[in-house]
Amino acid sequence: MITLYNTLTRQKEVFKPIEPGKVKMYVCGPTVYNYIHIGNARPAINYDVVRRYFEYQGYNVEYVSNFTDVDDKLIKRSQELNQSVPEIAEKYIAAFHEDVGALNVRKATSNPRVMDHMDDIIQFIKDLVDQGYAYESGGDVYFRTRKFEGYGKLSHQSIDDLKVGARIDAGEHKEDALDFTLWKKAKPGEISWDSPFGEGRPGWHIECSVMAFHELGPTIDIHAGGSDLQFPHHENEIAQSEAHNHAPFANYWMHNGFINIDNEKMSKSLGNFILVHDIIKEVDPDVLRFFMISVHYRSPINYNLELVESARSGLERIRNSYQLIEERAQIATNIENQQTYIDQIDAILNRFETVMNDDFNTANAITAWYDLAKLANKYVLENTTSTEVIDKFKAVYQIFSDVLGVPLKSKNADELLDEDVEKLIEERNEARKNKDFARADEIRDMLKSQNIILEDTPQGVRFKRG
């Protein structure tokens, strides 16, 4: 039984799908005017884990994540680079797939694009105008916010509270300061489309409503995105979707926390804006993913190199323990009376499922993985290995790897760099000083499996490749 925190109700709820055995999930994707930053990577990774866990539990997941390929930022970039909006969008959509692919994010069932749904968007807006929920003014089309009675239910704000900060900017032709744009009148030189309202382009909020409706129907199970999208974007999506469809837009709303850089908000003005395209040249993408899921998705996460290094070390320990299990599989025999270990492995798997069932708590799931690695190390160092137990270890390691999306072997597992070997030797020396001989032996065995031989010399431990 999976429970998740629903932003709409502000409480954990048991997940009940619209269709038995199926999950319809929509995740707000990026505006494709640049490479994605690590703030964009967090929802991509977190909701990929959510999808993977649903699938592990037997659900068929229809996972839709859009590309915003028409937007003010894209138009500005187009003017700066003297390139067309579609050219820029194509470049950064390809870059997005490359970056999230490196982070082991699985491809969505569908990645709808705004430009491909322009006729659908225009018709959706026309329907809202016909129903009295929207109106034309000065070439723009606005949504009548007050007409939708449930406005504010996602962000838990009242119309009166919202009115205090609302204003009508120069050039806008709203009936009410709370109204928001569905269609923008074209400006000279901007990309635009013909419509019953005149030349123009859609507003940001209407795009997601239409693509979600087209791909998944009037009501979806889960709508997800970053906390910054809760208001006004998701609030406006609810208003226009429910006004149009006369049905709940999404039964569950999930929002992930922010990313800070060295305890400061990430921003271009502070010079701490980190692009995934750049950071994965310095940090192993598997480590970056492992770091991202080391904190519960709803909690803020602080990015700094010290914490990333801690994640690298933790993932290395898991992988080293799995390597020992694989090595022992070659010499394992049919030994009986080892049910105690089978039971312990099952208990860890049950704990993993329990914490993942509780709002996808990846932080506690990783703790279970560490415990599995610790038990594996203890087993191979203290026992003649049983085929049954080794196979059980391998199966559960694979489950954890598949659900969390972290491979059990690095992409360059067979190409251990000299600097990595030196770090392992330092760690082994420290372990021996602390009389942690099990860890010291584990490192020695791991290096040996890579044909790296350690030699004691008067100058200290040296290594050579066999």
UniProtKB/Swiss-Prot annotation:
Superkingdom per UniProt: Bacteria
Subcellular location: Cytoplasm
An example Gene Ontology biological process: cysteinyl-tRNA aminoacylation
Protein name: Cysteine--tRNA ligase
Residues reported to bind Zn(2+): C28, C208, H233, E237
Nucleotide-binding as UniProt keyword: yes
Gene name as annotated: cysS
GO molecular function: ATP binding; cysteine-tRNA ligase activity; zinc ion binding
HAMAP family documented for this protein: Cys_tRNA_synth
Alphabetical UniProt keywords: Aminoacyl-tRNA synthetase, ATP-binding, Cytoplasm, Ligase, Metal-binding, Nucleotide-binding, Protein biosynthesis, Zinc
Family to which the UniProt record says this protein belongs: Belongs to the class-I aminoacyl-tRNA synthetase family.
SUPFAM superfamilies linked: Anticodon-binding domain of a subclass of class I aminoacyl-tRNA synthetases, Nucleotidylyl transferase
Origin organism lineage: Bacteria, Bacillati, Bacillota, Bacilli, Bacillales
Major subcellular site: cytoplasm
Position of sequence motif 'HIGH' region: 30-40
Record motif 'KMSKS' region, residues: 265-269
CC cofactor: Zn(2+)
InterPro entries, alphabetized: Cys-tRNA-ligase, Cys-tRNA-synt_Ia_DALR, Cys-tRNA/MSH_ligase, CysS_C, Rossmann-like_a/b/a_fold, tRNA-synt_1_cat_dom, tRNAsynth_Ia_anticodon-bd
Subunit details: Monomer.
Reaction catalysis annotation: tRNA(Cys) + L-cysteine + ATP = L-cysteinyl-tRNA(Cys) + AMP + diphosphate
Binding-site residues for ATP, renumbered to this chain: K268
Alphabetical list of NCBIfam families matching this protein: cysS
